[in-house]
Amino acid sequence: MENAIRSLQQEISEYELASIKDIEAFRLRYTVRKGLIAGLFGQLKSVLPADKPRMGQLLNQLRQTADDKLAAATAELASAESKTEPKLDLTLPGRRTFIGSEHPVQKVLGEMKGIFSSMGFSIATGPELELDRYNFDLLNFPPDHPARDMQDTFFITRGNANGDVLLRTHTSPVQIRVMLDQKPPIRVICPGKVYRNEAISSRSYCVFHQLEGLYIDKGVSFADLKATIFSFAHQMFGSDVKLRFRPSFFPFTEPSAEVDVSCYLCGGKGCRVCKKSGWLEIMGCGMVHPNVMRNSGIDPEKWSGYAFGMGVDRTVLLRYKIDDIRLLFENDVRMLRQFPA
């Protein structure tokens, strides 16, 4: 057995460990539980009792030699690999950290809320899934109004006991809910997301954001409405912006008007965005229709009020001179980075 130990010791000392593959092969051949060294330990039981102490000492020395050789080779290889890795230059600038910012729609909506809050308006919200009773009936829409058609409105379910369920087409239902829940005087704005079954283009989208306002009190007139809109427009677009009111029709207001501002791109000279008119529509408005007041339990003989509604996304286009509304919904980081926090 002593000869076998001496022979294995010579073999171990001459074994070259130049790579990870060599180290693993050495470990599997000599140092594992079923390796050659363990096999010699298993043969100790057949050695004469007088020779066992010396043979055991030789085997322990052999195992220690193998373990030391394996550890030294592993450390040397790790050290060589670390020297080949590129050094870290602490003088180089670190990677740039990009800080998120508020989306331009939310940024503008926040400014609009601030302007109207300074005028005494509170903020009211409501569900985006709405009943046609609030979206159409109580707002004085006749049964055959085109807005009720599936080509204009996203209906979720029809024929329910409580009425058809739809994605609200405007935030006016919030005004109805407020009038049903509160007694005049009322002064609220209703911001939120709305949905319409429209073709997607540079100027229209199937989902967009609206902000509507409602003011009901004694003696409220159209002059009060105009003063509110002029004040908002000058704070939002600048004191040099021009406005015009055009007579219009809405089922829920009478009289009604649409409000235009001078085109932000051409300065009123006429361009592709304003369709050569020099004007861009920003909102609709009017005095609250008496039928809407009655539907909400408010006496139109005692109270009067005005309402207005505008597209927040359209205002973003005006504010930042963007000519395609689709950019606001694509989440293109290249575009969003232009609006720092």
Curated annotation (Swiss-Prot):
Pfam families: Phe_tRNA-synt_N (PF02912), tRNA-synt_2d (PF01409). Binds 2 magnesium ions per tetramer. Its cofactor is Mg(2+). GO terms for molecular function: ATP binding; magnesium ion binding; phenylalanine-tRNA ligase activity; tRNA binding. One of its GO terms (biological process) is phenylalanyl-tRNA aminoacylation. PANTHER family: PHENYLALANINE--TRNA LIGASE, MITOCHONDRIAL, PHENYLALANYL-TRNA SYNTHETASE. This is Phenylalanine--tRNA ligase alpha subunit. The lineage of its organism: Bacteria, Pseudomonadati, Chlorobiota, Chlorobiia, Chlorobiales.
